[in-house]
């Protein structure tokens, strides 16, 4: 417990962000289920006609999903986990600041949930518009608690944004210029800038609302010379960049996933970077397209209509760059993965590229004035949250080997019938002991007993008994049949170049002549033949079966290793093996 409370390790904090986001997602989903149950049929269903309670549930659902699920997961979780690794930094620039930026979120969530139970609850909607959020409509302390919650969440996000900006600018590997940064790092960098510029405006807007409610000011009260439209301008100056704060990290994720599954670099790297910056800049210049119905003059509405349409240009650059990267020669060999990512890309971005009528409404003020408001739920949930969740799931699957440190390694597990726990056993050659201990340093905190080490003349092995965790149970159930390790039926789609590099790193041994032995002794001969066919078809490797002590191993020729060397070296664990003294590949 102390480790997680006081940790300054970026990966630990990233894990905390992801766990917190999952917890918040469950709360937000519970609110969503209540809303859908009430709307499932006409008339009063479950809330006894309490419209204030319905508004409170909608407000809590929106705040939880935006500020406590998507933002912590996309920026805090994946950002902390991947940005230092991608730029070669040992940690974030300000580790203790990183710690406090996370631990501000739990009290912020508690304040938000408390606001739903104080007096009649905060039934203002997520925009918190006055006069609905004023004393006349909400005289209790519920709205005040919601404002304090937003303050804490905003401080957390600003601290994290400063940390990311400093880390990217000052802690890159020597020789890594800005134009060599991975696109996901660029996405987090742009997102951090948007957070740093937009959140202070929101803080000022809700602080003035707080003083209107408690200190007799009249910033938004027309009776005292104020104007509630001022609040809308301030809120949407934050609110529209917030849309891109939520989705730009997804841009970086899609770029990496499409690149990996298409087997080629991202098309138009610089164009993608400048497109993200353009989207971020234009995001600050179009806020009033959310306010066409408040009585803006014609010239103002014409400007915001034109500016909103201009955002389609950098968005189009990104969508067509992704599609150009997807449809390559590798598309035929890896069609399922590439097609799924291409469809994901099309579904996500084409609506905002003015090709889907419902999402064109917000661009054109002449059309928007008539159906204003009815499509907002759809336009937030379909092209935003559904796609964001797909990004998170896709990236988690894609980075499984990086996070866990293993990719279908030559390990095996067995169940201990006494207590249902699993025993994980890894065996490596003596020369590869470094990778073995590196792997177990990642997994050691899951041990319920100290790892048992076996030294022999030709190999070293480590075994430990895991705690009863769902992940090990699923691993055992998915990759073992009758207690024996088996090759998954969809191994063709699962095995990427990154997975192959981890396989070589964990189970590969260089032999005389420059080839590689891939240990596959846990599998049957039929399964080994299937693996060889996958390597031949997918990676164009020349492979044959050899036998060691009567058990099959896969031999990859030196020519194939040379052909794959450039791709394999992109993955950090391969450097010591392909560039060290033991490597015979030049």
Curated annotation (Swiss-Prot):
Modifications made to the protein after synthesis: The mature protein may arise from proteolytic cleavage of an in-frame translation of COX1 exons 1 to 7 plus intron 7, containing the aI7 open reading frame.
Any one annotated GO CC term: respiratory chain complex IV
Entry keyword Nucleotide-binding: no
UniProt-recorded Gene Ontology molecular function terms: cytochrome-c oxidase activity; endonuclease activity; heme binding
Top-rank EC class of the record's enzyme: hydrolase
Gene3D superfamilies assigned: Cytochrome c oxidase-like, subunit I domain, Homing endonucleases
Name this polypeptide is given: Probable intron-encoded endonuclease aI7
Source organism of this protein record: Mycosarcoma maydis (Corn smut fungus)
Lineage: Eukaryota, Fungi, Dikarya, Basidiomycota, Ustilaginomycotina
């Amino acid at each position: 417990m102390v480790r997680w409370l006081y940790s300054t390790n970026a990966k630990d904090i990233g894990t905390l962000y992801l766990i917190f986001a999952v917890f918040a997602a469950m709360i937000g989903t519970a609110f969503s289920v209540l809303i859908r149950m009430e709307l499932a049929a006409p008339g009063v269903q479950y809330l006894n006609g309490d419209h204030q309670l319905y508004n409170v549930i909608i407000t809590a659902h929106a705040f939880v999903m935006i500020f406590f699920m998507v933002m912590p997961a996309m920026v805090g979780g994946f950002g902390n986990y991947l940005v230092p690794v991608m730029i070669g930094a040992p940690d974030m620039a300000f580790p203790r600041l990183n710690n406090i930026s996370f631990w501000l979120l739990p009290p912020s969530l508690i304040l938000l949930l408390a606001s739903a139970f104080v007096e009649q609850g905060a039934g203002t909607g997520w925009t918190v518009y006055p006069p609905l959020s004023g004393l006349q409509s909400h005289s209790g302390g519920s709205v005040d608690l919601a404002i304090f919650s937003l303050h804490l969440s905003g401080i957390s996000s600003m601290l994290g944004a400063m940390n990311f900006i400093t880390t990217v600018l000052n802690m890159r590997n020597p020789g890594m210029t800005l134009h060599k940064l991975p696109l996901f790092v660029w996405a987090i960098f742009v997102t951090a800038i948007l957070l740093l510029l937009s959140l202070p405006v929101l803080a000022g807007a809700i602080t003035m609302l707080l003083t209107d409610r408690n200190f007799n000011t009249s910033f938004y009260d027309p009776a005292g010379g104020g104007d509630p439209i001022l609040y809308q301008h301030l809120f949407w100056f934050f609110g529209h960049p917030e849309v891109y704060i939520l989705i730009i990290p997804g841009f970086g994720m899609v770029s990496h996933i499409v690149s990996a599954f298409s087997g080629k670099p991202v098309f138009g790297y610089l164009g993608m970077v400048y497109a993200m910056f353009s989207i971020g800049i234009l995001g600050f210049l179009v806020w009033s397209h959310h306010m066409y119905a408040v009585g803006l003059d014609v010239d103002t509405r014409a400007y915001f209509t034109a500016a909103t349409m201009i955002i389609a240009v950098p968005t189009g650059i990104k969508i067509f760059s992704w599609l150009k990267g997807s449809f390559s020669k590798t598309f035929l060999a890896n069609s399922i993965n590439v097609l799924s990512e291409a469809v994901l890309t099309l579904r996500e971005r084409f609506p905002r590229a003015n090709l889907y009528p419902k999402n064109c409404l917000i661009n054109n003020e002449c059309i928007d004035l008539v159906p204003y408001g009815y499509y907002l739920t759809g336009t937030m949930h379909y092209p935003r949250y559904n796609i964001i969740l797909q990004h998170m799931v896709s990236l988690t699957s894609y980075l499984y080997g990086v996070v866990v440190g293993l990719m279908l390694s030559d390990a095996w597990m067995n169940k201990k019938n006494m207590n249902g726990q699993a025993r994980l056993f890894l065996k490596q050659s003596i020369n590869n002991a470094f990778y073995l201990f590196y792997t177990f340093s990642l997994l050691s905190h899951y041990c319920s007993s100290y790892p048992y080490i076996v030294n022999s003349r030709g190999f070293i092995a480590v075994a430990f008994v895991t705690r009863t965790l769902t992940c090990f149970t699923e691993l055992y159930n998915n990759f073992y049949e009758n207690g024996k390790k088996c090759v998954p039926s969809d191994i063709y789609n699962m095995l990427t170049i990154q997975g192959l590099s981890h396989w070589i790193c964990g189970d590969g041994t260089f032999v005389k002549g420059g080839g590689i032995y891939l240990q596959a002794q846990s599998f049957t001969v039929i399964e080994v033949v299937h693996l060889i066919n996958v390597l031949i078809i997918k990676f164009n490797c020349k492979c044959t079966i050899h036998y060691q002590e009567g058990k099959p191993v896969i031999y990859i020729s030196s020519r194939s290793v040379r052909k794959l060397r450039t791709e394999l070296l992109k993955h950090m664990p391969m450097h010591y093996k392909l560039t060290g003294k033991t490597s015979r590949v030049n």
